Design a protein with these regions (language model features):
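Structural motif
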Residues: 1-2, 62
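Short, small-residue-biased leader/transition segments that mark boundaries at the very start
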Residues: 3-11
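Conserved beta-strand segments that form the floor/walls of ligand-binding pockets within enzyme
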Residues: 10, 91, 167
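Hydrophobic alpha-helical transmembrane segments of small proteolipidic membrane proteins, enriched
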Residues: 14-39, 149, 156, 161-164, ...
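Hydrophobic alpha-helical transmembrane segments of integral membrane proteins
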Residues: 22, 142, 156, 163, ...
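Polar-ligand-bearing catalytic/cofactor-coordination segments
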Residues: 33-138, 172-240
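Post-HExxH zinc-binding segment in Zn-dependent metallohydrolases
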Residues: 132-156, 191
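Loop-helix junctions at membrane interfaces
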Residues: 151-161, 170, 195, 225
Length: 240
């Protein structure tokens, strides 16, 4: 009886610890996102020298790196900027594509950093790209599998375990994304410094914006890991 009470207290303590962890990560995520939004709103109002738009920045960076087979296109929405290795396109959101600002330059250079990675066969990018089909499947089904798994854990624990494996795949993807995004920002910062498209003040602002963006990926990866551990704890706790 004492062992049972002790076990229940141990499980309750673990739950409390993870709830504190969740709240901490959620708060950190909110602060990072708020900081990033404020910086990009601020830097979107600061023009760069030469009147170069986001598209101009992207084309120049690609050409400076000897890349001529990547197209720069405009895509609808906000914060929809991305590089598509499948069709070799740098997709810039409308508020970046035609805008001459420090924020637009930073975003465009970052996305072109991915194109440079692709051209140089950067290993983490290749690994991330190879995982996309698996992650797409996992993302579509993992929450349903986990939900069913929690209701049937005492009868069919294999369902919950399968859900945890799917979630673990997305967590792994989050951590593989970190070096890819950080390296793309590093390439962007290096090019912005060498290309002469920003002055000293604007360059510092661009670096600050890119650094803040990188923090969002770190927080997202830690949040995914914390959630994974939470599901693992439920699985192991119920098995006890």
């Amino acid at each position: 009886s004492e062992c049972l009470v002790g076990s229940e207290m141990c499980i309750r303590d673990r739950y409390n610890m993870y709830w504190i962890l969740f709240i901490g990560i959620a708060l950190a995520s909110w602060l990072v996102q708020a900081n990033l939004k404020n910086k990009f709103e601020k830097y979107s109002k600061i023009p760069i020298d030469g009147g170069l738009t986001g598209r101009d920045i992207a084309v120049k960076m690609l050409h400076d790196n000897g890349i001529y087979d990547v197209e720069v296109v405009s895509t609808s929405g906000s914060l929809t900027d991305h590089y598509n290795p499948a069709n070799k396109t740098v997709n810039l959101s409308e508020d970046v594509y035609d805008t001459c600002s420090v924020a637009a330059a930073a975003v465009a250079a970052h996305e072109c950093g991915h194109a440079v990675q692709h051209a140089h066969a950067y290993a983490p990018l290749k690994m991330r790209s190879s995982l996309v089909p698996v992650i797409s499947f996992a993302s579509n089904w993992m929450m349903w599998v986990l939900l069913i798994g929690m209701f049937t854990l005492n009868v069919f624990p294999q369902i919950m375990l399968f859900g945890i494996i799917l979630f673990a795949a997305t967590t792994l993807f989050s951590f593989i994304t970190l070096p890819v995004e950080i390296d793309a920002s590093r390439r962007a910062v290096k090019w912005l410094s060498e290309a002469g498209v920003t002055n000293n003040r604007n360059y510092g602002a661009a670096v600050s914006a890119l650094r803040s963006a990188a923090y969002t990926y770190v927080v997202a990866a830690l949040g995914s890991l914390a959630t994974l551990l939470y599901y693992v704890m439920i699985f192991l706790g119920r098995r006890d």
